[in-house]
């Protein structure tokens, strides 16, 4: 098991592993902290977590959904200790075809805690320069993540932009002294891709077992009126934005490029994000299956299996 998280992250709720099987395929696993081992349904802790709903991350501190003893210790999937987890384990070919999937309650022991920068350095290493099994595992995961990402985008998943910044604070006054853009790397996309795959896989699993009682997450198709301003602005620069479906929107955004203004496309994607309908949690029995889809991810079903420590 390997952890890939930001530097200093303490509430670690996911790990990844990738093992080469005797038949040449890969065993790929996403393991998520088993919060239910410590929090019983209907308990005082469960009710308090429900009222908070999520952990809140401020510039200089974090307001936890669950007590710190759980979030940063007992439930946190830290390296070199045993932890309770739920695992989704796939058998995947080197070409990215999923052969089968299994779901298990597990006890995991993470052997490496990597920052995104460290994971990126593994990805960037030439294949011939390292025999380290951790490097090999991360490189295989990166290769699969690229394949899965391409499949999602080809199916119509959107690649939008949301500017992220981090503040540097004065150690005494806590006043901001600098603001820096947060740089996303391929290692970030690697983790994101497998979390999305886990959430989609679990959504399908719970629907098979609880067809009318599954808690899912839907993203309705946007209303055209919400996009009118953006469509008008893009048309002024000679581009047509098509929102008939997510694939057409993705293709029209990809085509809206100005060599003289390299940030034009990113600006369009930021504005597109603001035109979207909000995603919603819902019970599968409340909507028709055609209304379960997640527009932004181009996924017929989706849920939030990951991040149980913080939501």
Annotate the PLM regions.
Residues 1-311:
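Electropositive polyanion-binding surfaces
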């Amino acid at each position: 098991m390997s952890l890939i998280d930001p530097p200093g992250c303490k509430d670690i709720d996911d790990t990844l592993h990738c093992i080469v099987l005797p038949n040449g395929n890969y065993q790929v696993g996403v393991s998520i902290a088993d919060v239910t081992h410590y929090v019983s349904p209907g308990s005082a802790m469960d009710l308090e977590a429900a009222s908070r709903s999520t952990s809140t991350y401020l510039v200089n501190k974090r307001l936890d959904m669950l007590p710190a003893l759980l979030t940063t210790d007992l439930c946190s999937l830290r390296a070199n200790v045993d932890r309770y987890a739920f695992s989704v384990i796939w058998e995947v070919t080197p070409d990215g075809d999923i052969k089968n999937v299994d779901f298990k309650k597990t006890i995991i022991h993470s052997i490496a805690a990597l920052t995104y920068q460290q994971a990126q350095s593994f990805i960037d290493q030439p294949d011939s320069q390292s025999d380290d099994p951790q490097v090999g595992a991360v490189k295989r995961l990166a290769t699969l993540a690229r394949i899965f990402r391409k499949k999602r985008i080809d199916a119509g998943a959107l690649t939008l932009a949301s500017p992220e910044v981090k503040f540097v604070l004065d150690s005494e006054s806590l006043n901001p002294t600098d603001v820096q853009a947060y740089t996303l790397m391929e290692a970030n996309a690697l983790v994101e891709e497998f979390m999305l795959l886990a959430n989609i896989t679990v959504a399908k699993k719970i629907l098979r077992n609880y067809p009318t009682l599954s808690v899912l997450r839907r993203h309705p198709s946007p209303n055209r009126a919400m996009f009118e301003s953006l469509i008008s602005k893009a048309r002024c620069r000679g581009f047509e934005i098509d929102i008939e479906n997510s694939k057409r929107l993705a293709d029209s955004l990809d085509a809206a490029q100005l060599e003289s203004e390299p940030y034009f496309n990113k600006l369009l994607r930021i504005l597109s994000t603001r035109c979207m309908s909000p995603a919603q949690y819902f019970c599968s029995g409340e909507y028709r299956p055609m209304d379960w889809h997640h527009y932004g991810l181009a996924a017929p079903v989706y849920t939030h299996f990951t991040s149980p420590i913080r939501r």
